Amino acid sequence: MISKAFVTTLVATVANAASGVFDYKQNGKDWGHIAGNELCDHGKEQSPIDLTGGTYSNSQEININNLYPDGSTSIAIKDHTVQVTVGSGGFEKVFESGSASDFEALQFHFHAPSENTINGKHMDLEMHIVHKYASTDPAKYGAVLGFMFDMEEGGSGKNNLIEQVSKVFNSGNTSGTTTNGEVWLKGFLDSVDTDRFWSFDGSLTTPPCSEGIKWTVFQQVLPISAEQLAKFTNLWADNANYAGGNGNNREV
């Protein structure tokens, strides 16, 4: 069940890893060699994963509340992804045991191509909304909501949320570029079927690859246009730090 009467205004930046600067030259296969990132190599519940309809189900329940903020937005481009800071709002997740946890949104960001795969196939773009446990201070990462975009599976029409976030590219395409604007999440979430999702325990997909993360990836694949997708992929085209220009996605 989901309540979506909210509008969110956000600050967009590009994320560095929690444990320092990193790159995608080997799609994350070299991260575990750096002190503090050992889980990236030796963890037992690492993400991303391959999602299949028969393996992960909607046996758990989520409830997204209407506490996300609105206001002015500063959007900046830096190193590894477009990241949008939320700062409040969140959702409740009810587990099979009957227990529940409240999660507070921190930020959302993008990977192209997707990190999680569906039946072995990468989607064109994946968005992660990262949350902390609402009861912890300082922040302890606790949950990620994942959304897939693909021109073939979801359609090649323009996506309103992607259009709003990608306004930053109108001001330039280099690290440090900033602009002002608003990003509205209500219309985006209204377009998503939140009754069908995969739910699993995993990790952060960037260093230090912390585990114990409650993942929810919605099964509906959403539309994105070729023009919108290109604005993201152009960030790492011909850049050796992004697997030779092939993307900012971790492979496990």
List PLM regions with ranges.
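Alpha-carbonic anhydrase
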Residues: I2-V252
